[in-house]
UniProtKB/Swiss-Prot annotation:
Region (Protease): 40-130
Lineage: superkingdom: Viruses
Protein name: Enzymatic polyprotein
Pfam families per record: Peptidase_A3, RT_RNaseH, RVT_1
Source organism phylogeny: Viruses, Riboviria, Pararnavirae, Artverviricota, Revtraviricetes
Keyword entries, A-Z: Aspartyl protease, Endonuclease, Hydrolase, Nuclease, Nucleotidyltransferase, Protease, RNA-directed DNA polymerase, Transferase
Domain notes: The polymerase/reverse transcriptase (RT) and ribonuclease H (RH) domains are structured in five subdomains: finger, palm, thumb, connection and RNase H. Within the palm subdomain, the 'primer grip' region is thought to be involved in the positioning of the primer terminus for accommodating the incoming nucleotide. The RH domain stabilizes the association of RT with primer-template.
The enzyme's E.C. designation: 3.4.23.-, 2.7.7.49
Annotated family: Belongs to the caulimoviridae enzymatic polyprotein family.
A GO term for molecular function: aspartic-type endopeptidase activity
Organism in which the protein naturally occurs: Cauliflower mosaic virus (strain BBC)
Length: 679
């Protein structure tokens, strides 16, 4: 039987305890999925053998019944029984994570009591007048300032108010101390604390960076199934739409050079235990690709043609994140770190029934995968689901796109904690990272194919390289599709993209036979000449006022998103995004006023993630639009689309500013035809 001396005191006694130099209150922080951060004033009690917490500061779902109830003696000599326990809880103190194996539930008038079991776990525990120090299992001492005033937040309704998106008002904290400092030496100690921290700042930063490096080392490996690091928690299953059907695609022919390369790669895959010999009735051909990325790496990449298998299997509808939504999360952030999962899909184990479906042929024979292979249509969704489950609790400072992890913070102090928490989560789940691809503590970073730098963003340099490396004379529709795909990827950064694409897009129609003329070659040269670089665009901050400017011509519409940046009393309008498009055949017959209205609607749709739920400004040179939004259409069937447009626009909050057509230079440029502008 464990015995615990609980000091059940009156409020006066609690005040005396807090202000007494020998009693210790420190700040602590708890994180739970679905809740805001919970900040507590924790009482460090070396006379208590256990850690104790109020039921009002830890969500009910985290409490479980203790295997054996604990009988506890309290100050008046009587006994109480504690039957609820919370296991493996992380308590954040001074931006450091302290793991507590067990915390017991008991109402003591204090939110959280740090008992002697904690002090022994992180010994030596040293107490000074103004602070305490824990050092065990740390490569540096952790200094924690004592509080001169303590409060209790854990009351009825507190946890409900701390739920994310909760509209419940947080209860007022209960004061359990006074501001009085009985020991005058404490005032001197507090004043000197700033000087001490300044002297130790460089040392502490270096030590924390060393800790980050140690954590990174724990989770990095060249083997995605490293037996010393993987927890093999990610699992997947793939099903055929018709289980009775065998999916067979005939083998390919290989050159002697390819056969030699297959010998090396198949041996590597067998050594990694990601494949094994197969007796599956299914088969798909493997082949080697040697594109730009492979040439830079100096190694061809083995690919399996799963086109037939993908048609025959049931898909996974789990959505990948919207890239624009991810970018809105990092607005205003100053410091970044990014991590790449090592061969991410290979960290997901396939169940035994699914493995035969991945069977492939190559010069060495017939093999199947033990893990999720690249090329299966379900692979990105499967992996994204697992990553979201692992990192969702950290979404305020971390976003994940398939196997790319980005950590973002306002300052270096926060970032040290954020990166440590992400790496500890990777270690906990056995998520293995690539060390050579890790980028730590950067103000400028690459993510999602973008270069993010000091509040601006633009496509990475290789996007422009791909565009310029395309030949002026294209061979077939597939090559043209690849070229247009690259342009679309960078659409936010290319004014007039719709006009640029249209003459080329017309060549992809099914009923149009492939033909490439001298005029087409000249047009390709013109397109590439006009894409010599991508301007860095501003990433609008949440507090900045937004503007959209729009315009329409007979065939095209154009728009852009701008933000007003205030610097030392001066307003500067910065471009954030471009948008353009061509009107459909029926829309080309609309009145010019309707085309201008449709240009506004299309532009809002393009930038909706930034325009909800904020109030923004619409600028247009169309005099009709300002009156249109205030007109009251009364069910005239001929005006049906105007009624629909008004209803749609009513979901947004905006003002309308009319500008002269002669002043609307840029939006007008966006809507005019590319050939006319560049002829």
């Amino acid at each position: 039987m464990d015995h615990l001396l609980l000091k059940t005191q009156t409020q006066t006694e609690q005040v005396m305890n807090v202000t007494n130099p020998n009693s210790i209150y420190i700040k602590g922080r708890l994180y739970f999925k679905g809740y805001k951060k919970i900040e507590l004033h924790c009482f460090v009690d070396t006379g208590a053998s256990l850690c104790i917490a109020s039921k009002f500061v830890i969500p009910e779902e985290h409490w479980v019944n203790a295997e054996r109830p604990i009988m506890v003696k309290i100050a008046d000599g009587s006994s109480i029984t504690i039957s609820k326990v919370c296991k493996d809880i992380d308590l954040i103190i001074a931006r450091e994570i302290f793991k507590i194996p067990t915390v017991y539930q008991q109402e003591s008038g204090i939110d959280f009591i740090i008992g002697n079991n904690f002090c022994q776990l992180y010994e030596p525990f040293i107490q000074f007048t103004d602070r305490v120090i824990f050092t065990k299992n740390k490569s540096y001492p952790v200094h924690i300032a004592k509080l001169t005033r303590a409060v209790r937040v854990g009351t009825e309704g507190f946890l409900e108010s701390m739920k994310k998106r909760s509209k419940t008002q947080q209860p007022e904290p209960v004061n359990i101390s006074t501001n009085k400092i009985e020991n005058p030496l404490k005032e001197i100690a507090i004043l000197s604390e700033g000087r001490r921290l300044s002297e130790e700042k460089l040392f502490i930063t270096q030590q924390r960076m060393q800790k980050i490096e140690e954590l990174l080392e724990k989770v990095c490996s060249e083997n995605p199934l490293d037996p010393n690091k993987t927890k093999q928690w990610m699992k997947a299953s793939i099903k055929l739409s018709d289980p009775s059907k065998a999916i067979k695609v005939k083998p390919m022919k290989y050159s002697p050079m390819d056969r030699e390369e297959f010998d090396k790669q198949i041996k590597e895959l067998l050594d990694l235990k990601v494949i094994k010999p197969s007796k599956s009735p299914h088969m798909a051909p493997a082949f080697l690709v040697n594109n730009e990325a492979e040439k830079r790496r100096g190694k061809k990449r083995m690919v399996v043609n799963y086109k037939a298998m993908n048609k025959a299997t049931i898909g996974d509808a789990y959505n990948l994140p919207n890239k624009d939504e991810l970018l809105t999360l990092i607005r205003g952030k100053k410091i970044f770190s990014s991590f790449d999962c090592k061969s991410g899909f290979w960290q997901v184990l396939l169940d035994q029934e699914s493995r035969p479906l991945t069977a492939f042929t190559c010069p060495q024979g017939h093999y199947e995968w033990n893990v999720v292979p690249f090329g299966l249509k379900q692979a990105p969704s499967i992996f994204q689901r697992h990553m979201d489950e692992a990192f969702r609790v950290f979404r305020k400072f971390c976003c994940v796109y398939v196997d790319d992890i980005l950590v973002f913070s306002n300052n270096e102090e926060d970032h040290l904690l954020h990166v440590a928490m992400i790496l500890q989560k990777c270690n906990q789940h056995g998520i293995i990272l690539s060390k050579k691809k890790a980028q730590l503590f950067k103000k400028k970073i690459n993510f999602l194919g973008l270069e993010i730098d000091e509040g601006t963003h633009k496509p990475q340099g290789h996007i422009l390289e791909h565009i310029n490396k395309f030949p002026d004379t294209l061979e077939d529709k597939k090559q043209l599709q690849r070229f247009l795909g690259i342009l679309t990827y960078a659409s936010d950064y290319i004014p007039k993209l719709a006009q640029i694409r249209k003459p080329l897009q017309a060549k992809l129609k099914e009923n149009v036979p492939w033909k490439w003329t001298k005029e087409d070659t000249l047009y390709m040269q013109k397109v590439k000449k006009n894409l010599q670089g991508f301007p860095p665009l501003h990433h609008p901050l949440p507090e900045e006022k937004l503007i959209i400017e729009t315009d329409a011509s007979d065939d095209y519409w154009g728009g852009m998103l701008k933000a007003i940046k205030i610097n030392e009393g001066t307003n500067t309008e910065l471009i954030c995004r471009y948008a353009s498009g061509s009107f459909k055949a029926a829309e080309r017959n609309y009145h010019s006023n309707d085309k201008e209205t449709l240009a506004v609607i299309n532009t809002i749709k393009k930038f909706s993630i930034y325009l909800t739920p904020v109030h923004f400004l619409i600028r247009t040179d169309n005099t009709h639009f300002k009156s249109f939004v205030n007109l009251n259409y009364k069910g005239d069937s001929k005006l049906g689309r105007n009624i629909r447009w008004q209803a749609w626009l009513s979901h947004y909050s905006f003002d309308v500013e009319h500008i002269k057509g002669t002043d609307n230079h840029f939006a007008d440029f966006l809507s005019r035809e590319f050939n006319k502008v560049n002829s």
